[in-house]
Amino acid sequence: MVDEIRAALAAVADPEKAAPMQAYMKSAMPNLGVQKPARLAVLRPVLQRHRLPDRETWEDTVRMLWDGVSYREERYAATDLARHRAYAEWATDPRSLDLYDHLIVAGAWWDHVDEVAIKLVGPLLAAHPDQVAPVLRRWARDPDRWRRRTTVICQIGLRDTTDTALLADCVLANIDDPDFFLRKGIGWALREHVKSDPAWVRAFTTAYRARLSPLSLREATRTLP
């Protein structure tokens, strides 16, 4: 499957788009120039032809595609495989958190981390809060900024099922950090929660107005009614 995915992506490579895409990501890793619609279109038949037999094979395949990367789109494809509907049961298995941690730390940039955080870690947290929340609280204080950003943004999309105590803990663990991606992530997570509970966001931003960075505060309150 891995070789077929790489070949399928290479077959639709667009050199004219590759350089601008790489420049946008500010990454040393080259791009093939395959945008998301084309990537999903070529992946669909490959994933339909190959059905992985068990969770271990699924994880091994995701890791193989991710770790053997030559082009950025191959890692996007690894994430697509990880969150494919055929493997939803394995994706929300608590054992998969170690895989997601690997993708976060090895990916180490916002495009990879945000997808893993919101599309994989968030649903896993929703499925197994008692097992996942303690890990996220540890990550919120980890030296790795991408683990910390994950804890802040992973509940985006959970709406009414958001664990606001966990969200507050993860935000407060990083509220004084000057890192742009943490400050932006805090504002984004709070702004998204406005859609479900504006009163909670208003109370939180009022209570911590003096500590929230101007960027976080501006983003968090931008859509408050």
Annotate the PLM regions.
Residues 1-225:
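Alpha-helical scaffold domains
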